[in-house]
Amino acid sequence: MSQVTLLDEVSQWNQETCQQELKTVLPKLVAMHHDTDSWEEHTNILQIITSRFLPHLSLSDLETGCFSTALPKVVKVFASLLEEISKQIGGLSSQNTELQLFLRKILKTMVQTLECLSGCVRHVCSIEESVSFSNIRSLPSCILGVLKDTFQHCKDSEVMYSGRLSLVGDLLQGLFKEAYSLQKGLMELLDKINFEDTASEEEISDIVTVIHSLLDICLIISRLDIALHANTWKFIIKQSIKYQSLVEDRLHHTDISFALCEDLCRSVENCLELAQQIQQAGLQEAVHSPEYKLFQKATKMCRFFANTLVHYTKEFKVFLSKSCSRFHQLYLQINSKFLPSLCAPSVPPTLSEELRVAVLVPMDAMLTQMMSFQPFAESVLNPDHQSSAKLFLPQCLLLVNVMGKLSSQPEEALRLWSDGSQFPEETPRWSVFEAVFQSFRLCVLERLVPVCLPGVMLRGQAQGTVSLHQHVCVHMCACVAVLPAQHFPPLERSLLAAVLQADTQTALLATDVWCFLARYGTAELCYHHVVLIAHLLRACPAGGYQLFHLALVLRRLLFLMTPKHQVEFVERFPLSQEENLCVWRHTLLKCLCVEARVRVEEQVLDRATVVLEEWQNSGCRLGEIPRLNRILDCVLLVVGGSGTQNECVESLVKIISQLWSHMRSSQVQVHVTLQCTVKLLLSLSAVLIKSLEPHIILQAVSCLSGLSIHQCPDDLLLAALEFLASLGQIFIPPNIQGQVLPQISSLFNGFLTRPSWLILHHVLEAFGCFAEITNHEEVISQTLKTEEVKSKVLNFLSKTVSRQESEETRLERLKEWKCVIEKHCQQMESEKSQPAQTPLTEEPCAKRARQETKAEEEYERYLQTAEGALKALQAIERSEHSPSPPQWVRARLQLLQTLITQINTTTEEQS
């Protein structure tokens, strides 16, 4: 009997005949199916086998009698059908009817193949006996291979068929529908099968293959059908957990976790796009609109993926060490989509909150369960972690969230986060406190804007929004309050490191937390910290940012010391010792108890008197000015204290008067140390302005007028403005008004032309203070001569905004400021890290010219200094009121002459 005759005959048989001829005919059909090269015949035979003979096979014969022999050929033929479509698709058009019919025939054949496989699944599901995987082993692998190819073809169809999709669209739709039904049936079938704990190696390998194959399908169908995508993920997770003890060490956990992360990110982005469309269409309130229902459906998917990820990580955490960096990145990416992140899209608040609850609540639960997992902590606390600027704030908020959870963690997790890496062989990681300060420092733009965050509960009521600084500070202090004492050392090291870095606001945050630690701890701890900072201050180079930051901490902590410890501190760091002046110059007397304050005032005045006398007795040498400036800094401390006694005021006025008599504009302009002296004298004079004699005020104003304002450092200008503003408090005597008042007007005019907007703001403030209380109104009129100056002052006093800045423009400006601030901090820290003397290179020839130029610049600078000093000395001698110079002056000049001769001789020899 020929093949055609057999097929025609079998197609006429009823079910009873098929059952009777099963053992004879089925092997022949399988052989025919294997040997045929005709797609049509292949499909016809497969339909006959699955519809007429498969129902009569016993459960034990399904695999050997049908599936293992027939299904491998199905996979090959299905792949060849897809390959043929790819070859012929280029010629498809509405005019080429022959090719159109050919391709439609192939697609129909593919649909029929899927129908046959669905028939196999339905039959196995209908069997009442308990089905084992060995009974159907070839069926899942065949179906999953065909499904993967089918879904991939459907996914690529829009590009593959391009504008000709309408010619085959109905068949593609039917193909997808049949594949959808087939996968659903297969998952139902596999769900009925139960593996025993004694499952064979082969069976375990099979179920792992099924899970991985479904994962591959998940990656394909993510944008094709939401329901199928979700159901496939449910099945993957369910099967993974169902057979956890068998498959947990064989699953590709990294692939599964990465795929879940990508699907969650994609779903959140889809939700936000829908929310933006709703906002643009003005449908925020239309809760029954199709758009809003679509948004709710998308939000449901987000919640599903987030909860699925939480469930998966909970069950397989120990196998997810390689995925921790992706989980960390996911947390940052998701949080960057919501306020207060500056890159969060603009969406209606109600929709944003709905999505936030759906996603961030599960993400927080995931963070909680990952807290004790060391690879996750290492990823979050990695010192070398690099991320884009938009993730700086999410990283900071993540760390703040971690601190809030530490109190509920076991000791091992607490040590993991709070202590940092302890040994070289460990993966480097910061302590969470150090990481918070580092991430806060990076949030420059967020601090400039500033972003606002919800406040904590206070007396049963929620605070309003707070700044990032306050948010971080409150949560860090709350963490410190419950931190066991054995974890204080890494906290203290982190606080000190944050104080010693260049960003001032980060140092201020560390200072706030440090003060809380000092108040929360014992008095002895506070005293110990103050002594430590005092020693660090003594070791700091003058004028550095570290000195400024340490001084900030010292001032704050002195307030918190007990009176007994304050007195001990005064005794431990007496002002009679030169090295202690740098400690006291940065304190505030009002923070001290009465006994300590009186001691400091007495020591400062005694020391100042001694230093001034020694300076005058030595001939007012320029080299002694730095020593004089150090004690003047401390004198300013006394002046700034409240309730200064009359005796102190008299002593201070005497010191100030003597020093003003020695200041000459020509010298001040040249010497930086004298500029510092004048700055201090101006600040002192501003406070004691009502106690100064008129001729001293004249000397101060004249000295200030003689300076070239545009060449003075900013701190000197600010002190000058403070002094000028204080002049409004006094009445200038008539005999010197003609000399003083015009100079005041001229100085204000000069300051008002400063290009720096920051200095200009201080100038306007100072002029406003002066104008508000002065009796000399002619100074005001003389200052406001030009319309430009008058306009600046009036706009400032009336608080007129010159131009309104859009939010976009402001944000761009702040981004530019951010770059400037970061560059400035990096520059300061790089200067600090450079050695004092750069070692010579072995081959300096390439840079020889630059070294010579630098030497010439140094010669020029020092010669100018020497010339200025000699001219100033000459001016003193030529003065009419100057007495004859003492004998030691002539001797010193003779020594200088000898030194000049020696320098000339050396220069001639070298040339």
From Swiss-Prot:
InterPro entries tied to this protein: ARM-type_fold, DUF4487
PANTHER family: CHROMOSOME 1 OPEN READING FRAME 112 (PTHR16071), FIGNL1-INTERACTING REGULATOR OF RECOMBINATION AND MITOSIS (PTHR16071:SF2)
Primary localisation category: nucleus
Keyword Cytoplasm assigned: yes
A GO CC term assigned to this protein in UniProt: kinetochore
Source organism (scientific name): Danio rerio (Zebrafish)
GO terms of molecular function: protein kinase binding
Record-level GO BP terms: interstrand cross-link repair; mitotic cell cycle
A Pfam family of this chain: DUF4487
Keyword annotations from UniProtKB, A to Z: Centromere, Chromosome, Cytoplasm, Cytoskeleton, Kinetochore, Nucleus
Gene behind the chain: firrm
Compositional bias ranges of the Basic and acidic residues kind: 844-853
Reported function: May play a role in chromosome segregation.
Region Disordered, residue ranges: 830-853
Protein known as: FIGNL1-interacting regulator of recombination and mitosis
Subcellular location as annotated: Chromosome, Centromere, Kinetochore; Nucleus; Chromosome, Centromere; Midbody
Disulfide partners: none
Keyword Nucleus: yes
Superkingdom field: Eukaryota
